[in-house]
Structure formats: structure tokens, C-alpha cells
């Protein structure tokens, strides 16, 4: 008997290329995949007080970089290789927000990093019409409705985001990209969806589908040896079984 679950949109696959960690050891660093070829731009949404990821990435790939954050006046420290845009990411272009379309248009092999406190549910659905295929690799932190409901004052303007909208967004990403890394943020709680444990906040790494010619489900339990605790003093969440691994 085949049991279908909305969690199938988070099925994790084995990366066909080696992984590495970029950025600082704990929160703010991410596991990425070392892909063949080059990138032509780094677009980074959500900066706050940390550009360790951007600086490390640009040492490896000296390309144009745009960093977006409307909640800060300037970068944590000056870096001439990073163009700072004082705007938040959203579903439209205003004086205070951008949907990234104009920044993506000139490029074809983008590395995108996004940690924008729930507003991923606004901007990502606007990228479907051809723009998603410009993203060679995507690292994104998902702030699930479970977390949004717990902290409504923090996640202002996002009360309409429910599990259906979250999984619709993930299903949309899966049309053009393959999920190859999952890490639970241990600074939050955990919930159950269809009887399956899902952290309130989690980090995902996707590869564009032309780099995944054969999809093989992940066989490792999580976290992996490359992962680091977001909050060093908290234990990491251990995840295995569907949809995380065959283990």
C-alpha cells in the first residue's frame, strides 16, 4: 500500500557532487555543494550582523554579490566586493522591498542564499516563470507556519501562511530543483505533520535539476558530519526515515 503524505515535498536526495560548509561554524553557515563550472552572481537575502557566508563564498568565487536587508543601515563591516541593498525581499518592488526579478534577469547561474524570516513565502512563488532556472544552487532557511504562529509579533504580516502554502512553495521549487541537504535549526521547537517530525525552522540546499541526472534517495540519518548546531549549547535534532533518509 502506497501512503501519500504532504511531507513528500521534502524528500531528500543524495548529492552527485561533494558537499562543503561555507560561513561561520554555527548559525549563519550552510552546507553547500561543490558543483562543476562557475556562478555568475551571488544573491543573498537576509544579513543582520553576519556576512561570514558571503565573504567565504566570494573568496572561492570572485563574482558580483548583492546583499539585501532592509532591517539594517549598512553591512556589519565594509566589504567592497559586496553591494548592499537596503531592501527586504518580498512579492513586489517598492521603496522598501524587492522581488529580485531585476537583479536576476542579467544572470544565468546564480547562487542564492536566503534567510528572511518567513518572507520566503512571499518572494519564492514570484520566481516561477523562468527565473527559478537561473538559480544554479539555492540555500534557504524555512520558517514554518508552526514557528510563525508561535511568534506572531515577530512574524508580522505572515499570519496567512499555513502548511498548505509552505508545501505549495516547496513543491514549486521541486519543479526545477532537487533537495540534497536538510538541517534542522536546533534553536526552535519541533512539530509533527502526518505523524512525521519536522522542525519549526530548517535549512535546505537545492541543486538545479540539470546537475542531478539520477535521483537517489538519501541514506544517511541527519545531522551529517558537515552540519553544526545553530545554537552550540542545544542538542541537534536527529532525523531519519521518510522523507529524510532510507535509514
Regions found by a protein language model. Give the residues of each.
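Conserved beta-strand signature within the Rossmann-like core of class I S-adenosyl-L-methionine
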Residues: 112, 134-145, 149
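Short, polar loop motifs at secondary-structure junctions
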Residues: 49, 67-75
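Short loop/helix-cap segments at secondary-structure boundaries that form the rim of catalytic
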Residues: 57-58, 73-82, 130-133
Amino acid at each position: 500500500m502506497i501512503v501519500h503524505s504532504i511531507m513528500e515535498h521534502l524528500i531528500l536526495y543524495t548529492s552527485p557532487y561533494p558537499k562543503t560548509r561555507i560561513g561561520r561554524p554555527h548559525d549563519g553557515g550552510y552546507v553547500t555543494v561543490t558543483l562543476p563550472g562557475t556562478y555568475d552572481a551571488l544573491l543573498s537575502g537576509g544579513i543582520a550582523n553576519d556576512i561570514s557566508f558571503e565573504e567565504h563564498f566570494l573568496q572561492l568565487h570572485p563574482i558580483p554579490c548583492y546583499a539585501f536587508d532592509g532591517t539594517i543601515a549598512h553591512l556589519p563591516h565594509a566589504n567592497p566586493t559586496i553591494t548592499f541593498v537596503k531592501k527586504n525581499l518580498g512579492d513586489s518592488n517598492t521603496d522598501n522591498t524587492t522581488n529580485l526579478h531585476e537583479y536576476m534577469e542579467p544572470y544565468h547561474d546564480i547562487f542564492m542564499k536566503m534567510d528572511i524570516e518567513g518572507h520566503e513565502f512571499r518572494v519564492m512563488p514570484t520566481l516561477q516563470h523562468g527565473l527559478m532556472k537561473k538559480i544554479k544552487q539555492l540555500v534557504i532557511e524555512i520558517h514554518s507556519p508552526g514557528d510563525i504562529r508561535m511568534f506572531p509579533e515577530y512574524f508580522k504580516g505572515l499570519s496567512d501562511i499555513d502548511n498548505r502554502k509552505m508545501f505549495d512553495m516547496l513543491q514549486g521549487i521541486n519543479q526545477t530543483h532537487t533537495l540534497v541537504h536538510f538541517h534542522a535549526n536546533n534553536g526552535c521547537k519541533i512539530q509533527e505533520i502526518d505523524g512525521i517530525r519536522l522542525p519549526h525552522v530548517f535549512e535546505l540546499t537545492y541543486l538545479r535539476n540539470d546537475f542531478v541526472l539520477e535521483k537517489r534517495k538519501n541514506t544517511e540519518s541527519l545531522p551529517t558530519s558537515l552540519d553544526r548546531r545553530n545554537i552550540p549549547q542545544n542538542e541537534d535534532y536527529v532525523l531519519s526515515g521518510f522523507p529524510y533518509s532510507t535509514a
